[in-house]
């Protein structure tokens, strides 16, 4: 988005939500960190201008306006990082809202009106697109676990059919467990060597048991991130779900539980 904004306006800029992930931003005070810039040997003059996500960064250049068929002078706003934008779209703004994204990876995005740092160094402290802050946990394998299990192992793309034998009453009552660390793990373990596995398999275990275990394993990995935040006094008033995994009724129930 920052490159697109540059081509539209000629302004070299970014927003706070995206800049938070660069390790060069003083997230609390919303400015470039002189300490980090000095360590990296980077002059602040070379850094992009910083804007809130809703702030106009400039207007369309004559060239961009002509190519787009729009009038010159149209304002262009900074925009937001992917997870921050998704959170805003799901209503996770203000304080104490949680948006869970189940895509290839999974994120737990908890909004806050004040800046706070995770004392266990397991969650990110970032600026939010609404002008506030948020804690974020990210698991590396979420819906990708289900895709791997269905397409690569079971050789099917009929996800709904495979989940039909799994009723809501069976959730949490399965004796087969799954660790979803197919690509190592980010939050809250920060362990690139972590690996996935099925645990508790018996002679009478079924493919439905294993399918359920995959869904539950991802749900519990998300819960790990939520519990880290709650253990530090972060209150969550409501939560929403987005991403491809949100299409699964079982994951919806698992998230709510």
Where would I find each of the regions flagged by the language model?
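A conserved helix-loop-beta module that forms one wall/lid of the active-site cleft
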Residues: 40-52
């Amino acid at each position: 988005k920052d490159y697109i904004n540059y081509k539209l306006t000629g302004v070299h800029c970014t927003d706070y939500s995206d800049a938070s992930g660069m390790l060069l931003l003083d997230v609390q005070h919303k400015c470039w960190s002189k300490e980090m810039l000095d360590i990296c040997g980077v002059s602040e003059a070379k850094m992009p201008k910083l804007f809130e996500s809703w702030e106009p960064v400039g207007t369309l250049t004559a060239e961009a306006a002509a190519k787009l068929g729009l009038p010159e002078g149209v304002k262009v706003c900074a925009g937001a990082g992917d997870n921050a934008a998704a959170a805003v779209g799901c209503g996770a703004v203000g304080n104490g809202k949680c948006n869970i994204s189940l895509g290839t990876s999974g994120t737990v995005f908890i909004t806050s009106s004040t800046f706070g740092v995770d004392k266990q160094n397991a969650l990110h402290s970032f600026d939010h697109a609404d002008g506030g802050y948020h804690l974020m946990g990210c698991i590396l394998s979420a819906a990708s676990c289900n895709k791997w299990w269905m397409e690569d192992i079971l050789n099917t793309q009929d996800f709904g059919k495979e989940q039909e034998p799994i009723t809501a009453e069976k959730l949490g009552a399965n004796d087969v467990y799954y660790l979803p660390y197919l690509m190592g793990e980010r939050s809250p373990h920060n362990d690139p060597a972590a690996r996935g596995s099925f645990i508790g398999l018996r002679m009478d275990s079924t493919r439905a048991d294993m399918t359920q275990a995959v869904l539950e394993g991802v749900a519990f990995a998300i819960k790990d991130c939520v519990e880290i935040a709650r253990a530090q006094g972060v209150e969550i008033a409501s939560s929403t779900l987005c991403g491809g995994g949100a299409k699964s009724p079982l994951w919806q129930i698992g998230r709510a539980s």
